[in-house]
């Protein structure tokens, strides 16, 4: 596929104006963020599929109408050495699909460090796979309450905006705390690559394309693009699309998907009002949560107060080689008993950043003989095993996984090949349909929820297929 601009449509939606083939291919640095990006495209009217392994011709043949292909990954919690080993092959396989934009999809809170989930390292690897001479970066996503102004990232919680280094959750992230909101400075710790900015004032100017062309060079600089509102969102999408040339690599949040969709919509290439169908209610759902977020903690508390059965996974026991299997058995038994009575269940490892399971996690891991990272993955595998056994023992049609690492572990254990969007719930956490060669898993309805997504009624909303109380 080349970089020529599709013909200007005459009126309404004009699908024939699209260039042939894929429009975008992306690798998500965690599973929940990958579904967020898929939702943004699908809701806008761009058929999208999310693969949970490298996309093969055989798998993609099941989705002949797609214009966007994603692959869910786990690099946000990985070392730079892991990235050096794993990302080149993955990104090469996505680049080979021929889309003009290859994206490394990052979280809209940009949580990363030189040691863990290095976005800079991912960029240095990714730019080798596309011919472009700049690497745009779109992080702001107003729909998710993320805003970038003059290179600084802000996020709103409960109607209050915070600079990211003062955000009540991200500034205290247990692995990658954000202590710098200026993304130029934060990213400069992770790469020696030149970093530039198109700020919100330049973006609205008449000569912004000239400015981009002046920045383009063989060293392929990273160019951050401010996004504050719907106007700057659409302008960012226009800039990326019109300056894609023969193909570009970008490390961006789902703000990129929202930006491209806004531009395409403005040109009449997409329906004027983005939407997804609603879902039907189910009697009961099962959820597992490895999230430490106060947002998820509030959601667990709401669910408990509204008739859900909540069961804590005891981490010292779960990590102990002698007690781990028994702890999983205990949790599964309690959860199964509730589900057979038609009661929804949440199995969780923590409730918020001040939970002793979080504040004392290093000591718990050390006592079990694990480094922090290895212990965290073992907890994710324990939650995945709980979900697998619940699905094998109870008739369940809809499940939830909260937390990016947990989502990856669960999807792997369940043998899911791909996901597509079934229905809309809240921005960033759609209801998905699982595609699997395993008949018992094919058609499973699943929600993968990031820690910061949703209000307190989230689990009730998933069960009802709509906002609780609506």
From Swiss-Prot:
Pathway in which the depicted protein is active: Carbohydrate metabolism
Residues bound to substrate: 30, 78
GO molecular function: ATP binding; kinase activity
UniProt-listed Enzyme Commission number(s): 2.7.1.231
Domain of life: Bacteria
Annotated catalysed reactions: 3-oxoisoapionate + ATP = 3-oxoisoapionate 4-phosphate + ADP + H(+)
Methyltransferase among keywords: no
Keyword annotations of the record: ATP-binding, Carbohydrate metabolism, Kinase, Nucleotide-binding, Transferase
Sites where the protein binds ATP: 291, 403-406, 451
Matches recorded under InterPro entries: 4-carb_acid_sugar_kinase_N, 4-carb_acid_sugar_kinase_N_sf, NBD_C, NBD_C_sf, OiaK
Pfam entry (one): NBD_C
Recorded family membership: Belongs to the four-carbon acid sugar kinase family.
Role this protein plays: Involved in catabolism of D-apiose. Catalyzes the phosphorylation of 3-oxo-isoapionate to 3-oxo-isoapionate 4-phosphate.
Name the record gives this protein: 3-oxo-isoapionate kinase
Protein source organism: Paraburkholderia graminis (strain ATCC 700544 / DSM 17151 / LMG 18924 / NCIMB 13744 / C4D1M)
